[in-house]
């Protein structure tokens, strides 16, 4: 048989310190080899005894061969082993621990009560027996003694087989943390020479072999037993109690065994054999061998030291919020399937395959202490049935069997403080009560659609909040999506929503129309069929604040929940359409007639109706109720638009078509002539078809007095600018210019030429600036300049400037620029007084003659 010894975490060889406290003084290789040899001999003897057909209480499993598991680092064999915890390692451990125990009394029986604690994996009873074994180690030894011890252990294991497997899960830490604690305990309690002396004897070697075989089993319960932040407190409390109560030198090894990290093989047997469910001792029955030292039934009387150690070890476990009665329910994972739980049907124990246990929210330190899920002991396949007697033997130690191997003998503590729930926690029985009993408020339960996504971490927090506020009478478990998947209620009436979230939702909802929104929202909730609503809103009626918006909603994101009623949405859409249409109408009206609304079409027979009083035409004085008010953008942006409903006044259009009307003439005489021509009466007779030469418009070769006066005004305002004496005229040699006038009062413009011939001239730069305002091309302005500049001195006098202005005005009227300016134009531009012909009045001939005759 090949065997290998590794540490509990599978990383390397197990140190003697982590295996036992007795081997810490002599970690030699020969001792380990002897220990392995002793364990091998004990196990082979057990196989030979079972092959001979000896009557033992532990049956062989069907196909229960040991499969080596990588990662556990425990002793692996290819031969078959027994199922009820009686494998070779445990038999060797029990053989070494119980050989020299004295006849059982009430005190000794209480000392054998084993309770796994978070701070230590050893038991009080095994510690006492280990002390006694080491004290008598010098007088015993040999393989024959090991065979005798093995038979003795088989009898005790047969007598103390448990009638029911405890369902309490142990809270045992990993072996790595316990080994470090064992080193501290070995330093704090040094072994006496009496206890350290038999460590090299043959019995000590067998004890080391049993301990190594038991310690190499990976504690699967460490996956579930790791609790949040309570391990260090339990270890500290245990160390303080050991320091406060010193023991004599003969009991020093007993203290070391109490805190030893290596669980002895008798641990699992003693707890299962002596304790039933709830700490009640089970009565041994069935076939058993005649033992040389029969022991009476165990009692419930426990010594004071055992009770104190149990209280200190289960202090952290009591705060975890899990009682043993609640732990007996079915353990469900996320998918809802039942985890490994042995059930008795027809005298058979059915053990399903173990599954990996998953933690939620564990820290990094806890994940580092995880031990591989495959245990050291034999694991049964799924569906393997083990026949049992009336009193079933110990079931195979699987992953969940080791989880629930701890039982509290003391009265069950009350769990007050609850820690965060683990993923492997069983479902609350309250969930199943709602399946059989109808709900009081007749709420319809709808089968969940496949489109609904399983709740995330944020949604699980919402579930806890809804359970705490009491809005729902059903507790929703995190392990299952919903408990409504298994049934459909017979009630078909829609369930009303709670009023508390409705009021809270109405407070946050935007108040577009408060009355319509509050009324229609309640109606829409009642009228909405239950099949349309999201299932998450029924199981979690508490409102959830959306991160992006300021609104509360009941939806989980799978199906939309109407946050606003249909009436509110319709009102909002209509209001937006009206606002946009009104704004467009106002814009068009303001473009057509900025201050007035469009005029309705007039009636027939009232086309030429005129109001008698002009002050009545003002629309602001009309009654305001005659015409409805037109919506305005602001109060001050537009004038008041009120007036009578029917207005017969005709308003002049802003503009007419330019193709039907001639532009207004700039000259007054031309407009007057056109006006008189239009109102001239038509001739009744004469040449009807003859062309009237005088009626057509001609270009005139002279300017009117009105035109000349307008042009002279422009000349007067720009003459003499930028000119000095001697600019435009040649003076004689003895000519002296006049002194400039006195400008003490600031009445004279020094930029103009004073009294001199240059004062009546307009310089070329000024002429160009004035003529360029006509927007005629530069070449045409140059042609006009060449026609009027007769002196070629760079400046124009009064007559030249006036003729040039007239030519530009004629070009703007559409006439071409002539090649030569006529004499009539120059004469009309001269400043002269026209002669007036006054006719003498007509008189009677006689009277005139007589009168004249009388005068002369």
From Swiss-Prot:
Matches recorded under InterPro entries: EF-hand-dom_pair, EH_dom
Domain EH: 743-832
Composition bias type Basic residues, residue spans: 239-254, 603-620
Superkingdom: Eukaryota
Residue stretches of biased makeup (Polar residues): 255-275, 303-315, 396-410, 451-468, 478-488, 644-654
Stretch list, region Disordered: 1-204, 230-563, 589-672
Key words of the record: Lipid metabolism
Database matches in Gene3D superfamilies: EF-hand
Segments of skewed composition (Low complexity): 12-42, 67-84, 111-130, 194-204, 517-535
Basic and acidic residues: bias regions: 152-162, 329-347, 503-514
Record GO biological process: lipid metabolic process
Gene Ontology terms: cellular component: cytoplasm
Entry keyword annotation includes Transport: no
Function of the protein: Positive regulator of phosphatidylinositol 4,5-bisphosphate turnover and negatively regulates signaling through the cell integrity pathway. Involved in rDNA silencing.
Family: Belongs to the IRS4 family.
Protein name: Increased rDNA silencing protein 4
Organism annotation: Neurospora crassa (strain ATCC 24698 / 74-OR23-1A / CBS 708.71 / DSM 1257 / FGSC 987)
């Amino acid at each position: 048989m090949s065997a290998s010894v590794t540490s509990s975490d599978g990383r390397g060889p197990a140190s003697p310190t982590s295996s036992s406290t007795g081997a810490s003084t002599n970690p030699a290789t020969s001792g380990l080899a002897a220990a392995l040899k002793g364990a091998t001999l004990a196990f082979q003897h057990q196989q030979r005894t079972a092959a001979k057909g000896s009557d033992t209480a532990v049956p062989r499993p069907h196909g229960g061969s040991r499969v080596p598991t990588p990662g556990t680092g425990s002793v692996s064999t290819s031969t078959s082993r027994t199922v009820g915890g009686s494998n070779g390692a445990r038999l060797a451990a029990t053989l070494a621990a119980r050989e020299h125990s004295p006849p059982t009394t009430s005190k000794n029986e209480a000392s054998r009560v084993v309770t796994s604690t978070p701070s230590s994996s050893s038991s009080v009873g095994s510690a006492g027996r280990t002390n006694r074994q080491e004290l008598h180690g010098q007088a015993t030894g040999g393989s024959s003694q090991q065979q005798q011890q093995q038979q003795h252990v088989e009898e005790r294991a047969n007598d103390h087989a448990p009638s029911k497997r405890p369902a309490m899960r142990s809270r045992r830490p990993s072996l790595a943390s316990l080994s470090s604690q064992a080193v501290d305990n070995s330093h704090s309690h040094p072994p006496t020479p009496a206890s350290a002396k038999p460590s090299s004897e043959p019995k000590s070697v067998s004890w080391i072999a049993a301990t190594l075989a038991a310690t190499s089993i990976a504690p699967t319960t460490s996956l579930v037993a790791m609790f949040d932040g309570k391990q260090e407190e339990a270890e500290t409390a245990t160390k303080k109690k050991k320091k406060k109560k010193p023991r004599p030198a003969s009991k020093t090894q007993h203290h070391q065994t109490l805190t030893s990290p290596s669980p002895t093989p008798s641990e699992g047997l003693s707890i299962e054999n002596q304790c039933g469910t709830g700490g009640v001792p089970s009565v041994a029955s069935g076939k058993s061998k005649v033992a040389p030292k029969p022991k009476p039934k165990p009692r419930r009387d426990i010594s004071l030291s055992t009770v104190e150690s149990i209280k200190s070890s289960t202090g952290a476990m009591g705060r975890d919020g899990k009682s043993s009665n609640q732990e007996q329910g079915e353990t469900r994972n996320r998918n809802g399937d039942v985890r490994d739980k042995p059930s008795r049907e027809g005298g058979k124990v059915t053990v399903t395959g173990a599954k990996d246990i998953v933690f939620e929210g564990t820290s990094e330190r806890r994940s580092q202490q995880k031990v591989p899920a495959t245990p050291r002991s034999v694991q049964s396949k799924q569906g393997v049935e083990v026949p049992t007697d009336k009193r079933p033997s110990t079931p195979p130690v699987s992953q969940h069997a080791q989880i629930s191997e701890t039982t509290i003998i003391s009265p069950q503590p009350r769990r007050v403080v609850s820690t965060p729930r683990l993923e492997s926690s069983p479902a609350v029985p309250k969930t199943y009560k709602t399946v059989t009993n109808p709900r009081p408020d007749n709420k319809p339960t709808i089968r969940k659609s496949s489109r609904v996504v399983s709740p995330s971490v944020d949604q699980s927090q919402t579930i806890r909040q809804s359970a705490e506020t009491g809005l729902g009478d059903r507790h929703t478990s995190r392990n299952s999506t919903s408990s409504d998947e298994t049934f459909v209620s017979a009630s078909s009436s829609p369930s009303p929503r709670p009023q508390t979230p409705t009021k809270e939702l109405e407070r946050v909802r935007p108040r577009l129309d408060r009355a319509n929104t509050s009324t229609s929202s309640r109606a829409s909730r009642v009228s909405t069929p239950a099949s349309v609503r999201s299932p998450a809103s029924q199981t979690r009626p508490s409102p959830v604040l959306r991160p992006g918006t300021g609104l509360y909603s009941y939806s989980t994101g799978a199906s939309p929940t109407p946050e606003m009623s249909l009436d509110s949405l319709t009102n909002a859409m209509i209001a937006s359409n009206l606002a946009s249409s009104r704004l467009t109408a106002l814009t068009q009206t303001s473009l057509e007639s900025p201050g007035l609304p469009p005029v309705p079409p007039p009636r027939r027979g009232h086309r030429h109706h005129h109001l008698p009083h002009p002050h009545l035409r003002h629309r602001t004085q009309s009654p305001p109720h005659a015409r409805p008010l037109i919506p305005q953008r602001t109060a001050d942006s537009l004038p008041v638009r009120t007036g009578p409903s029917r207005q017969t006044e005709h308003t002049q259009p802003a503009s007419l078509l330019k193709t039907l009307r001639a532009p207004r003439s700039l000259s007054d005489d031309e407009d007057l002539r056109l006006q008189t021509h239009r109102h001239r009466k038509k001739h009744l007779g004469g040449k009807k078809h003859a062309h009237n030469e005088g009626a057509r418009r001609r270009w005139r070769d002279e300017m009117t007095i009105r035109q000349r006066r307008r042009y002279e005004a422009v000349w007067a305002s720009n003459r003499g600018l930028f000119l000095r004496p001697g600019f435009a005229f040649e003076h004689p040699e003895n000519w002296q210019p006049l002194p400039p006038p006195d400008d003490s009062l600031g009445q004279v413009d020094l930029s103009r030429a004073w009294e001199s011939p240059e004062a009546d001239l307009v310089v070329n730069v000024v002429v160009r600036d004035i003529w360029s305002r006509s927007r005629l091309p530069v070449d045409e302005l140059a042609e006009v300049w060449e026609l009027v500049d007769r002196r070629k001195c760079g400046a124009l006098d009064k007559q030249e400037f006036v003729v040039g202005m007239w030519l530009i005005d004629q070009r703007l009227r559409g006439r071409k620029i002539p090649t030569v300016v006529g004499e009539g134009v120059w004469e009309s531009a001269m400043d002269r007084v026209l002669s007036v012909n006054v006719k003498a009045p007509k008189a009677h001939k006689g009277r005139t003659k007589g009168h004249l005759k009388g005068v002369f």
